């Protein structure tokens, strides 16, 4: 507590490295609690302070550059799907056929799951059917936001579904490494909140936040939402659409 008094008004909001890390990864301001501006504290500190002004300039430069998330999604958007290359003739039709085939497989899996749970006596059958139908609707909305296929998400789905193909093993390894990176960040946020709660309880934060409640809320942040979300709609290998142009993905 004596150490906390020494901090004065200083807070995590003034952590240049954390803000830069979040920006470089691609945390959207709209996803921050209350849509907060991550640079507001630095703008105040930059007034009359040369070092803080330099930090602010560096953060503003980072904001002007493509984030890791944006670069990642631009990259997976160009994934060859069923041997069809991004922008090639007939690519849109080939991607649509793949997505429709996957969604049909997903629908069948959801229906089978609802039937099995009914046989096990797992609660109200009608509620389970509705729950699985909602899960399928979620898959449709994820792959076809506003009715249009997202080729980036289609690319992610293809990589995750056929990860054993030689050409897709290293892209899948990279995707999983980024998920692991964010998982580590989430674990750190949770551990930080528990440390604060253990030492100081639920006092108001030095930056004026609700303290531990605010820290717990930040552990819900997800930057690479699509990389996490795609795992919700995968189907077993035997249920996948039949692979076309398999030789394209070989050694």
Predicted regions and their residues:
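Extended amphipathic alpha-helical segments with heptad-repeat/coiled-coil character used for oligomerization
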Residues: 2-79, 83-84
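C-terminal accessory extensions/subdomains outside the catalytic/core fold
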Residues: 58, 62-251
């Amino acid at each position: 507590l004596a150490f906390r008094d020494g901090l004065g008004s200083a807070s995590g909001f003034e952590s240049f490295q954390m803000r830069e890390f979040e920006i470089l990864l691609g945390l959207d301001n709209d996803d921050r609690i209350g849509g907060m501006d991550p640079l507001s504290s630095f703008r105040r500190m930059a007034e009359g302070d040369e070092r803080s002004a330099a930090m602010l300039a560096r953060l503003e430069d980072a904001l002007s550059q493509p984030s890791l998330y944006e670069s990642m999604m631009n990259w997976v958007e160009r994934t060859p799907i069923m041997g069809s290359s991004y922008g090639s003739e007939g690519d849109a039709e080939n991607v649509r056929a793949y997505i429709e085939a996957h969604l049909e497989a997903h629908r069948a899996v959801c229906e089978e799951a609802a039937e099995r749970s009914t046989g096990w006596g797992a609660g109200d059958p009608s509620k389970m059917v509705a729950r699985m139908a909602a899960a399928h609707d979620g898959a449709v909305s994820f792959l076809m936001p506003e009715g249009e296929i997202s080729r980036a998400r289609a690319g992610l789905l293809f990589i995750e579904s056929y990860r054993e193909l030689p050409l897709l093993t290293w892209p899948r390894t990279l995707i999983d490494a980024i998920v692991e990176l964010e998982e580590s960040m989430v674990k750190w946020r949770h551990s930080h909140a528990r440390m604060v709660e253990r030492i100081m309880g639920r006092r108001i934060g030095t930056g004026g936040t609700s303290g531990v409640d605010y820290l717990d809320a930040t552990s819900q942040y997800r930057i690479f939402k699509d990389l996490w979300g795609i795992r919700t709609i995968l189907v077993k290998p035997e249920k996948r659409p039949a692979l076309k142009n398999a030789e394209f993905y070989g050694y």
